């Protein structure tokens, strides 16, 4: 197997296959569940809006794919600074049956100099999650400033995040190697049990390999696993399957 094929295989096993569109329906989520069961093995998770969790759970059970985790989003996509609403949404997501919650950090508040609300929001949402995994989306493409990307990562980890995630996929700049370098360095300094999720903008096996390479350089090859590394993506899967010669070439897409 070539290095590119190895990267494609790993990326599928590390993928949160995502649909977070305004026109999502039960049928689109059912289709997503079927796609997550690939000829190259199952993706790590699917990521969907909370209201679709019950139909996703039913579908994955019917497919015998109980190992695929169900992730959802809260305080999404704008990262508002209302802690009470973020906590209510997170509690509701857990009640729906989410295995993982991706919450948006109040990044605009941080840009305005308020560090406290981000820390408190993540801390409160982690408490609401209990044993459910909490990923914190810092929206690195909007923060832009390396110092702000670093600070959002530090605050999230200090507040109890299980993962830090680059992006919502709803802004012009999503996952970048520069942001990955900063975020993974913070993980190496603070707590190597915390995971990292680049989301949006990873289009093919070559790009996936670049992100994996940064993680391995900073934290070691043994660190990378579904417990510590995920790709958030919608259009990436078809490209990876094509690399593995298990699907036709993907059509151009604007997908996440």
Curated annotation (Swiss-Prot):
Give the top-rank taxon of the lineage listed in the UniProt record for this protein.
Bacteria
Q: Which reaction does it catalyse?
A: 2-deoxy-D-ribose 5-phosphate = D-glyceraldehyde 3-phosphate + acetaldehyde
| Cytoplasm in keyword set | yes
Under the heading Gene3D superfamilies, the entry gives:
Aldolase class I
Enzyme class, spelled out: lyase
Q: Name one GO biological process term.
A: deoxyribonucleotide catabolic process
* Record's signal peptide: none
Q: In which pathway does it act?
A: Carbohydrate degradation; 2-deoxy-D-ribose 1-phosphate degradation; D-glyceraldehyde 3-phosphate and acetaldehyde from 2-deoxy-alpha-D-ribose 1-phosphate: step 2/2
Question: Which keywords does this Swiss-Prot/TrEMBL entry list?
Answer: Cytoplasm, Lyase, Schiff base
Q: Which InterPro entries does the entry link to? A: Aldolase_TIM (IPR013785), DeoC (IPR011343), DeoC/FbaB/LacD_aldolase (IPR002915), DeoC_typeII (IPR023649)
Localization of this protein? Cytoplasm
One GO CC annotation: cytoplasm
| EC number(s) per entry | 4.1.2.4
Gene Ontology molecular function terms on file:
deoxyribose-phosphate aldolase activity
User: What does the record give as the active site?
Assistant: 102, 165, 197
Q: Which HAMAP family match?
A: DeoC_type2
Q: Which family does it belong to?
A: Belongs to the DeoC/FbaB aldolase family. DeoC type 2 subfamily.
Q: What does this protein do?
A: Catalyzes a reversible aldol reaction between acetaldehyde and D-glyceraldehyde 3-phosphate to generate 2-deoxy-D-ribose 5-phosphate.
**Record protein name field:** Deoxyribose-phosphate aldolase
- What organism is this sequence from? Shewanella sp. (strain MR-7)
């Amino acid at each position: 197997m070539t290095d590119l094929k190895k990267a494609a295989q790993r990326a599928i096993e590390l993928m949160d296959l995502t649909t977070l569109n305004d026109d999502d329906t039960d049928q689109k989520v059912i289709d997503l569940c079927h796609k997550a069961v690939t000829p190259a093995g199952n993706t790590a998770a699917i990521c969907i809006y909370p209201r679709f969790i019950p139909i996703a759970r039913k579908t994955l059970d019917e497919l015998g794919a109980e190992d695929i985790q169900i992730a959802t989003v809260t305080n999404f996509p704008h990262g508002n600074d209302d802690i009470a609403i973020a906590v209510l949404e997170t509690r509701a997501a857990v009640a729906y049956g989410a295995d993982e919650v991706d919450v948006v950090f109040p990044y605009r508040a941080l840009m305005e100099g308020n560090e406290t609300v981000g820390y408190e929001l993540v801390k409160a949402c982690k408490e609401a999650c209990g044993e459910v995994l909490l990923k914190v989306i810092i929206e690195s493409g909007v923060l832009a400033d390396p110092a702000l990307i670093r600070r959002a990562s530090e605050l999230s980890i200090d507040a109890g995040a299980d993962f830090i995630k680059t992006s919502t996929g709803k802004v012009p700049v999503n996952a970048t190697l520069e942001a990955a370098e900063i975020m993974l360095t913070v993980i190496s300094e603070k707590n190597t049990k915390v995971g990292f999720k680049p989301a949006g903008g990873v289009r093919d096996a070559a790009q996936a390999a670049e992100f994996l390479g940064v993680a391995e350089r900073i934290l070691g090859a043994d660190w990378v696993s579904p417990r510590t590394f995920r790709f958030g993506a919608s259009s990436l899967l078809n490209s990876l399957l094509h690399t593995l010669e298990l699907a036709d070439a993907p059509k151009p897409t604007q997908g996440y």
